[in-house]
Structures are given as structure tokens and as C-alpha cells.
């Protein structure tokens, strides 16, 4: 009986020694893991913006890092989730360094209520979370956030009151359109289609115009568009009131808006 108790006592002591050793080495390993996040690189695709963020994981600890997950959630100023992106690494062995690219891809037309961000500047909140597991024994997580400004590509969009010039069969509607491109990412290269509809919703005139406004370069001078557009209209279908529909079409987005018109006299 005494031998059994002595063996149990030694087994308990050894178990506690191993447990303390494990805790010490795990803490040591945790403090010897370095995660360096580099400067994001920007890529513009046909219909999306991609931020590629380089991350370097230096595991100088005594255990492998398992199930490394980097997740980024982008929210608007009201806390609504706009998009989510994750990167996963199954193993970073001990005493090794691993390089990954964490990509955040934005397709404007897939963002909820994206058209509001085409004409209004705002701030986006970027929430990052990093989760990992030391030696398949101790899970850890790190959470941090940042804020980035969003510049609207059609900021301060202004559509002036239309005016008309008449002849025997047609009239020409003149319409001034202006805006500023506050986006450092989006090159506004596309078309602006203008349609004139009478009060019966009949299309009585249409014209298309090229637009080419470069992205904002950060020098305080916003690239601007300010043009007076001309649209031929069929006089026989012209009514005293109606509306003018404008459609911006680019590789990054499409945006449609309407303004009413009202004439004091037709002839």
C-alpha cells in the first residue's frame, strides 16, 4: 500500500511538472510569434477593387501554429456589414516563417445600398480578427480595427434645370451635369445616357455622352466633370411636364437617377 501511495505521489508531481513546463513553453511560444502586416496593394479589376494585404507570420516558438485564420469584416458608419473576407493557413511549423496574401475584394454592385456610396463620402470600419491554435492545445485570438475614408466617385452630383431651343420639328434640350470624383480607386471611364420622357412615360429624346474623369490623387484638387449636354427631342410628343433620366455606365458600376422637367410654354 505504501509503495502504491508513493508511486501515486510521484506520478502527481511529475504530472504537475509537465503541466507547468507545458504552460511555460506555450507562453514562451506565444510571445515569440510575430505577425507583421505590410502595406496593402491595390488592384483594379473589370468590376471590382482588390486590396491585397501581405502578412508575414514568424513562428519562433516551440510549437507549430495550427488553423491560422485571418478574417476581415467591412462595416459602414451605422454598423451594417458590407463584406467579409477570410484567409486560412493550416500549419506554420515551429521555427519557420510563412508569407500569405490576405485579399479583400469589393464589387460595388454587391454591396447593400451601394448607390448611396456613389454620391456620398463616408468612413468604413475595418474589423480584423486573427485566430490560431498553439500545438493543437491552446487557442488564441486577436481582434483589432481601423477606419478608412471612402470617397464618392459622383460626389455632389448636380443636375441643372433644363432649357430648350425650338425649330419646326424638333427642340434641343440643354442640361448641365456636374460632379467631382473623390475616389482614389475608381477611374470614371464610361458613358452617360440621357433620356427625355414626357408625362405619358414615352421616350421622346435620347443621347449618349462619353465620360472620363480620373481618380483623385490626394493633392486636394478633385477631378471634376462639368458639361452642358444637348438632347434632341420630338416636338410632336413633347408635353409641358415630364422627366429626364440619367444613366451612368462604367466597368465598376451603373447608376440611374431622374429629375423632373416643367416647361412654361411649348411653342
Q: Would you name each region that the model predicts?
A:
Residues 22-49, 143-170:
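Low-complexity, acidic Ser/Thr/Pro/Gly-rich terminal tails and inter-domain linkers that flank the onset
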Residues 62-67, 81-82, 182-189, 204:
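Short acidic/proline- and small/hydrophobic-mixed sequence motifs that coincide with surface turns
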Residues 155-202:
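Surface-exposed interaction/gating patches
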Residues 47-64, 169-184:
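Short beta-strand elements of extracellular/lumenal beta-sandwich folds
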Residues 79-115, 202-235:
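Intrinsically disordered, low-complexity Pro/Gly/Ser/Thr-rich segments with frequent PxxP/GP/PP motifs
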Residues 1-35, 177:
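Secretory targeting signatures
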Residues 107-154, 222-225, 231-267:
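Terminal connector regions
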Amino acid at each position: 500500500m505504501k509503495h502504491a501511495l508513493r508511486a501515486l505521489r510521484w506520478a502527481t508531481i511529475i504530472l504537475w511538472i509537465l503541466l507547468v513546463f507545458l504552460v511555460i513553453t506555450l507562453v514562451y511560444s506565444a510571445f515569440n510569434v510575430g505577425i507583421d502586416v505590410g502595406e496593402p496593394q491595390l488592384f483594379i479589376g473589370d468590376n471590382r477593387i482588390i486590396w491585397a494585404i501581405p502578412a508575414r507570420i514568424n513562428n519562433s516558438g516551440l510549437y507549430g501554429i495550427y488553423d491560422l485564420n485571418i478574417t476581415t469584416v467591412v462595416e459602414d458608419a451605422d454598423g451594417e456589414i458590407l463584406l467579409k473576407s477570410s484567409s486560412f493557413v493550416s500549419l506554420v511549423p515551429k521555427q519557420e516563417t510563412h508569407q500569405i496574401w490576405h485579399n479583400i475584394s469589393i464589387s460595388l454592385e454587391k454591396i447593400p445600398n451601394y448607390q448611396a456610396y456613389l454620391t456620398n463620402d463616408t468612413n468604413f470600419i475595418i474589423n480584423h480578427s486573427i485566430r490560431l491554435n498553439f500545438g493543437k492545445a491552446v487557442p488564441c485570438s486577436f481582434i483589432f480595427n481601423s477606419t478608412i475614408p471612402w470617397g464618392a466617385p459622383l460626389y455632389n452630383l448636380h443636375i441643372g434645370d433644363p432649357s430648350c431651343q425650338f425649330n419646326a420639328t424638333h427642340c434641343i434640350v440643354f442640361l448641365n451635369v456636374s460632379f467631382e470624383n473623390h475616389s482614389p480607386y475608381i477611374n470614371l471611364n464610361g458613358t452617360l445616357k440621357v433620356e427625355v420622357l414626357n408625362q405619358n412615360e414615352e421616350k421622346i429624346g435620347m443621347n449618349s455622352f462619353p465620360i472620363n474623369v480620373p481618380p483623385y490623387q490626394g493633392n486636394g484638387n478633385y477631378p471634376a466633370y462639368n458639361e452642358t449636354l444637348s438632347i434632341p427631342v420630338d416636338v410632336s410628343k413633347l408635353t409641358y411636364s415630364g422627366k429626364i433620366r440619367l444613366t451612368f455606365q462604367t466597368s465598376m458600376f451603373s447608376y440611374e437617377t431622374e429629375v423632373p422637367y416643367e416647361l412654361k410654354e411649348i411653342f
